[in-house]
């Protein structure tokens, strides 16, 4: 992949979607790996990665993607194992964003703001049910199927009952999420 052209493409896209180490810890990276590994065989093939990126609106030239990914696949393997995927992520982070903390200060607050902005697609400061549904669909999650289900998700977080989630409601929700150890 030609890095300069890819940097230009990424800089034109929303700054809310980044492959940054501070906001994507090992647990989150495992979740991404599992989402991309469509057949659950423990490997991400170039085809699976290409499809996942396309669902996220990040279309990449297949031959460039294959060339890059192939350099991380171990001999006699059909795709990226998690460790290979993590190494690819780290290399892309360093190449495109200058490594850890280059874009934001890496504080929990800025990480939450960045995560919020992924869902707030129109930038109005609120997450609507339609915006949440779009992101869930891009991620291939079944919860995106019915707008009524997505609206229930919004209502469960919407403490001021205005039908949408603002940053403070999002932050409160994220701070109450328990991550299994």
From Swiss-Prot:
One example of the protein's molecular function in GO is: calcium ion sensor activity
The record's account of tissue expression is: Expressed specifically in roots.
Supply the Gene3D superfamilies for this chain: EF-hand (1.10.238.10)
Q: What induces it?
A: In leaves by infection with the bacterial pathogen P.syringae.
Which residues are listed for Ca(2+) 3 binding in this entry? Answer: 158, 160, 162, 164, 169
Positions bound to Ca(2+) 1: 37, 39, 41, 48
Q: Which InterPro entries match?
A: Centrin_CML-like, EF-hand-dom_pair, EF_Hand_1_Ca_BS, EF_hand_dom
Per UniProt, Ca(2+) 2 binds at 120, 122, 124, 131
**Keywords from the UniProt entry:** Calcium, Metal-binding, Repeat
Gene Ontology process terms (BP): response to calcium ion
The answer to whether the entry has keyword Repeat is yes
- Gene Ontology CC entries for this record: cytosol; nucleus
Q: Which domain of life is it from?
A: Eukaryota
- Give residue ranges for domain EF-hand: 24-59, 107-142, 145-180
Q: Which PANTHER family does this UniProt record tie to the protein? A: CALCIUM BINDING PROTEIN (PTHR23050)
What exactly does this protein do? Answer: Calcium-binding protein that may mediate calcium-dependent signal during plant defense response.
Q: What is the protein named?
A: Probable calcium-binding protein CML43
Source species: Arabidopsis thaliana
Give the gene that encodes this protein.
CML43
């Amino acid at each position: 992949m030609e890095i300069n052209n890819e940097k230009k493409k990424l800089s034109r896209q929303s700054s809310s979607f980044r492959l940054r180490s501070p906001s994507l810890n090992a647990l989150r990276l495992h979740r991404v790996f599992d989402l991309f590994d469509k057949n659950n065989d423990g490997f991400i093939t170039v085809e699976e990665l290409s499809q996942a990126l396309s669902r996220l609106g990040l279309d990449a030239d297949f031959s460039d993607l294959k060339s890059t990914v192939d350099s991380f696949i171990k001999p006699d393997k059909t795709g990226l194992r998690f460790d290979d995927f993590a190494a690819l992520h780290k290399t892309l982070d360093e190449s495109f964003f200058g490594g850890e903390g280059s874009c934001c200060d890496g504080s929990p607050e800025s990480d939450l703001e960045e995560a919020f902005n992924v869902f707030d697609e129109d930038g109005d400061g609120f997450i609507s049910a339609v915006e949440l549904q779009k992101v869930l669909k891009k991620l291939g999650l079944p919860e995106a199927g019915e707008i009524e289900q997505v609206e229930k998700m919004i209502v469960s977080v919407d403490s001021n009952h205005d039908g949408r989630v603002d940053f403070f409601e999002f932050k409160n929700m994220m701070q109450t999420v328990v991550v299994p150890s």
